[in-house]
Every structure is written in structure tokens, then in C-alpha cells.
Design a protein with these regions (language model features):
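N-terminal glycine-/serine-/threonine-rich beta1-alpha1-beta2 phosphate-ribose binding loop
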Residues: 1-97, 119-123, 279-281, 288
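Hydrophobic residues in well-ordered beta-strands that form the structural core
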Residues: 65, 103, 128-130
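C-terminal helix-rich "cap/oligomerization" subdomain common to oxidoreductases
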Residues: 77-78, 254-289
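Short helix/strand-capping hinge loops at secondary-structure junctions
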Residues: 98-100, 105-106
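A contiguous active-site-proximal alpha/beta segment in oxidoreductase catalytic domains
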Residues: 107-164
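Rossmann-like dinucleotide-binding domain that binds NAD(P)(H)
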Residues: 154-220, 263-266, 270
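Interdomain hinge/lid region at the active-site interface
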Residues: 218-257
Length: 289
């Protein structure tokens, strides 16, 4: 495990290393970690030591001084650092281990870094994937239909000033849900800025429209799926947990086959990059690059 500055490290370790129960995930154990941390990101420097200590005392996780020392101790790597800016350099080092890597959200803070991570992995012959757990939420799995004509998703949208792609910090969750429901194929994005949230509209190559509504002051997620003969909407009691994603991670570590293609993940970042440029240009439609 790389990076102990996110609550995910505690939740994931409980699921992998904890006793049998509804959220227990068989097939993997967290055994060693590198602390990491970012001194200029509040949610990192205020938590990195606390979570590291919790992993040591409650779960007896061994800590190492650098990523190279992690390599011989593990069979696969969870790159968990909360700061997406650190992922490129940490992934560069992790790939030298030659072992499969899961990179937690956000994959990176820029499209360029995301593409460079993918290039380095290809060069090293290492398999990887990155995703939000919302891809496997009841919202995304229950409402997915092959005949959908369009999708609207919504979710929290707080930002972090050091992340150029502001959607990557937290709105990655509703963006990931959008792609889970729509599939890849977006060609153009338009973003409208509002006082209480933004609306990001993607036009797919087949003419469908996929929309994300950010809600900075709300922690609720949802979706509406448009179909030829009606509309389906999520309801508030639909559940979301890390467990389905963790099971996919274990399967990926064993098979080397990512549950989300690297190409789709990179398109998600191209979508967010186009949304950022649309915002900077006053809502102008921007083609994905």
C-alpha cells in the first residue's frame, strides 16, 4: 500500500484483513505500507500520520521507508495517496516492482499525467487500473441499460486548489457513474458554471448526451437514465460501498485483466480536461483531445 493519507486505507484494510462479515473481501491481505503524504494538501498532512499509526497499532502493518523496499514484500500494489499530483512519480516507482497496480482516484491531477502513467505502465509491461467505487454502486449497476438514449448523474463537487482538473478531486465520482452508464465515446464537452453547482454536458459520437451536475454542498449521489419508452431514476436508499470494487481489485490482481479498460479511464480524464477548458473559455464547447 502506498500513501496513508486517505480514509480508504483504513476501510480497505478492514475489508481485506478483518473477520468474516458482509464487507469482508477474501483473497488479499494488506501486509506493508509506505506512508507518503503531501505537506501542502490539508486532507493529507492532517491525516497521514494518524492513519499510519492506526494501521500499525490495529492491523500490525509493516511500514517501509521508500517504495523500492515495498516491492519484495508484496504481490500487488494499492496506490492510495489522496493527492493525485503524487501519483505519476509514485506509479513510476511502483511499476519497477513489475507487479499489478490499482491506482485510487484520482488517477492524476492532469490529463498529461494520466497519459504518462499509462505510457510508463506499457513500457514496464505492468497492468494497472483506476476507478471510483461509485462505478459499482447500486445506482450504476441497477440503472445500466444497453438501450439508454442519455444519462444525467449528480454528486458532490468540492475542489482542491492544487488539482488543475477540478472535477478530478471529487466530482470524479459522478463522472465515473456517467461513464459506467453511458460507456466511452464522448467527442465534445460543454460546461456551464452556476452559483450552486456546474452542469457538464458531453456529446457522444452516436448523438447521445451525457450530463453531470455537481453539487458542492451536498453529499448525495443519483442518476436518471433516459430510454426509448421512459425514464428510470435512482432512489435515495440505493447503496454504495467499497466492497464490490475491492472484489474487482482482487480479481484484477489474480488475472491481470482490468475491470475498466485503461482507454476508458483515459477518456474520462480527456472528458474532465475538456470540461476544464470549457470552464476557462466561458462555456465554449471543447472537443476531447
Amino acid at each position: 500500500m502506498i500513501g496513508t493519507d486517505t480514509s480508504h486505507v483504513i476501510a480497505f484494510t478492514k475489508s481485506f484483513n478483518g473477520p468474516p462479515g458482509p464487507n469482508h473481501v477474501e483473497g488479499a491481505r494488506v501486509v506493508a505500507a509506505y506512508k507518503g503524504g503531501s505537506p501542502d494538501v490539508e486532507s493529507s498532512y492532517t491525516r497521514v500520520d494518524k492513519f499510519a499509526e492506526q494501521l500499525k497499532t490495529e492491523w500490525k502493518i509493516e511500514f517501509v521507508d521508500d517504495i523500492a523496499q515495498l516491492c519484495p514484500k508484496v504481490d500487488a500494489i494499492l496506490l492510495e495517496s489522496v493527492d493525485g499530483r503524487t501519483h505519476l512519480e509514485q506509479a513510476r516507482q511502483a511499476f519497477t516492482c513489475g507487479k499489478p497496480v490499482f491506482i485510487d482516484k484520482p488517477l492524476a491531477s492532469t490529463l498529461e499525467d494520466a497519459r504518462e502513467i499509462a505510457r510508463l505502465a506499457r513500457e514496464a509491461g505492468v497492468t494497472w487500473f483506476s476507478s471510483s467505487s461509485l462505478r459499482w454502486s447500486e445506482i450504476a449497476t441497477t440503472l445500466k441499460h444497453e438501450d439508454s438514449t442519455g444519462v444525467l448523474t449528480w454528486g458532490p463537487g468540492p475542489t482542491e486548489p492544487h488539482h488543475y482538473l477540478d472535477l478530478s478531486w471529487y466530482a470524479i465520482h459522478p463522472v465515473e457513474m456517467l461513464y459506467a452508464l453511458m460507456g466511452p465515446g464522448c467527442v465534445e464537452v460543454t460546461r456551464t458554471i452556476g452559483k450552486t453547482g456546474d452542469i457538464i454536458v458531453g456529446r457522444w459520437e452516436d448523438g447521445r448526451l451525457g450530463t453531470v451536475r455537481t453539487q458542492p454542498q451536498s453529499w448525495k449521489y443519483g442518476a436518471v437514465v433516459f430510454r426509448p419508452k421512459g425514464v428510470e431514476q435512482s432512489h435515495p436508499d440505493m447503496k454504495s460501498s467499497y466492497t464490490p470494487m475491492l472484489r474487482e481489485i482482487v480479481k484484477f490482481f489474480r488475472t491481470g485483466t482490468p475491470p475498466v479498460s485503461n482507454e476508458e479511464t483515459l477518456e474520462i480524464f480527456a472528458f474532465m480536461d475538456a470540461a476544464q477548458k470549457s470552464k476557462e473559455q466561458g462555456g465554449k464547447p471543447i472537443k476531447l483531445r
